[in-house]
C-alpha cells in the first residue's frame, strides 16, 4: 500500500489518532501510523520507519511526529538526512491537522501537504477568550 502521510508518536497515540480520523473522515487511504513498540528498540523502530519511507520513494512520505526532540522525531530526523528528496518531517501532529491533510491527500504532493500541515496546525490553536473579545 502506498502512503503519503505517516503518524509517529509516543505510546499508542498514533493509532488512536488514526482510528479517530477513520471515525470522523471515513477513509484513511494514504495515511499510516506506527505505534512505538514496547519495549522500545531504536534500531527496530528505525527500520520500520525506513521500510515505509523506502516503499514510498516515488510519491514521498510526510512524517508527522508528536514532539520535537522525542524518539519518533529523532529517529525520523536521522532518516531525513538520507531521504530528504522524498521525505518531509513535521512535529506537533493533531487531529485537526490530520483531517485537513485527508481532505487534500489525493491531490497534493508531500511538499504541499507539509505546508497544509504547518498552517492547519498553527491555525487550529485558538485562544477562545481572545477570539470572543475581538468580535
Predicted segments with their positions:
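N-terminal loops that bind phosphate or other acidic moieties
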Residues: 2-91, 95-135
Amino acid at each position: 500500500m502506498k502512503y503519503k502521510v505517516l503518524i509517529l508518536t509516543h505510546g499508542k497515540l498514533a493509532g488512536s489518532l488514526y482510528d479517530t480520523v477513520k471515525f470522523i473522515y471515513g477513509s484513511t487511504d494514504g495515511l499510516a501510523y506506527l505505534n512505538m513498540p514496547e519495549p522500545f528498540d531504536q534500531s527496530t523502530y528505525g527500520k520500520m520507519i525506513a521500510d515505509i519511507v523506502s516503499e514510498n520513494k516515488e510519491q514521498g512520505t510526510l512524517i508527522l511526529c508528536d514532539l520535537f526532540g522525542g524518539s519518533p522525531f529523532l529517529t525520523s530526523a536521522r532518516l531525513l538526512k538520507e531521504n530528504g528528496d522524498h521525505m518531509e518531517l513535521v512535529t506537533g501532529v493533531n487531529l485537526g491537522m490530520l483531517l485537513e491533510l485527508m481532505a487534500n491527500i489525493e491531490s497534493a504532493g508531500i511538499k504541499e501537504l507539509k505546508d497544509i500541515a504547518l498552517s492547519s496546525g498553527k491555525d487550529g490553536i485558538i485562544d477562545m477568550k481572545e477570539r470572543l473579545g475581538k468580535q
